[in-house]
């Protein structure tokens, strides 16, 4: 972990009232240059035995292409990198061949600029992202389960766990 001098971990609150859900997303911390250098030092220590997860939005004090910067920095280290991010954050890392990306079905629709409502639509979109560099694509669909398109093109589906969905 890297202790930051200013700010806290970003806090996100979801408020659910009947069938409507509202998101309140906190700003996140301010990351100073020396703290960023400490992150780079930790990243540089990773080996091919490690897996790195890049998830969520980037703090406003960092460059908007931070995920690309990290992936470029690690490109020759053969580290498995998984990315769970939205639209441009996700699509801009594809040339660096992430091991796994995890868009949800709504994010996929946003990336492709059209509603993707069937399993075939989602699998086709996942394969398009693979052609752009992603190795494995895991599509989450909240209460409808998930679809994994593996690097060899095999499609796996899983229902959502049984239970009462509180929020997504």
Enumerate the language-model features and the residues they cover.
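Structural motif
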Residues: 1, 11-12, 21-23, 50-51, ...
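Short hydrophobic/aromatic-enriched beta-strand-loop microsegments
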Residues: 1-3, 99-109, 156-162
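Conserved N-terminal subdomain of the carbohydrate kinase-like
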Residues: 1-51
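Short loop/turn segments that connect beta-strands within the blades of beta-propeller domains
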Residues: 17-18, 86, 142, 151
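Short, acidic/turn-prone active-site loops that include or flank metal/cofactor-
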Residues: 27-30, 87, 105-108, 161-165
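Short, charged, surface-exposed secondary-structure boundary motifs
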Residues: 34, 110-116, 165-168
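Conserved beta-alpha-beta core of the PfkB/ribokinase-like small-molecule kinase fold
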Residues: 51-122
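Conserved phosphate-binding/catalytic region of the ribokinase-like
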Residues: 72-73, 119-168
């Amino acid at each position: 972990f890297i202790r930051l001098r200013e700010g806290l971990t970003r806090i996100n609150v979801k408020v659910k009232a009947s069938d409507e859900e509202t998101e309140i997303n906190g700003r996140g911390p301010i990351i100073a240059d020396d703290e960023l250098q400490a992150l780079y030092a930790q990243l540089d220590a990773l080996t091919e035995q490690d897996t790195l997860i890049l998830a969520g939005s980037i703090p406003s004090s960092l460059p908007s292409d931070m995920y690309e910067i990290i992936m470029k920095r690690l490109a020759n280290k053969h580290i498995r990198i998984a990315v769970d991010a939205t639209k441009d954050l996700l699509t801009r890392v594809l040339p660096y061949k992430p091991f796994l990306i995890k868009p949800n079905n709504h994010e996929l629709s946003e990336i492709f600029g059209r509603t993707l409502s069937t399993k075939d639509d989602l699998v086709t979109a996942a394969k398009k992202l693979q052609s752009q560099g992603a190795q494995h694509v895991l599509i989450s669909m909240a209460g409808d389960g998930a679809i994994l398109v593996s690097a060899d093109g095999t499609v796996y589906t899983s229902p959502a766990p049984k239970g009462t969905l509180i929020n997504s």
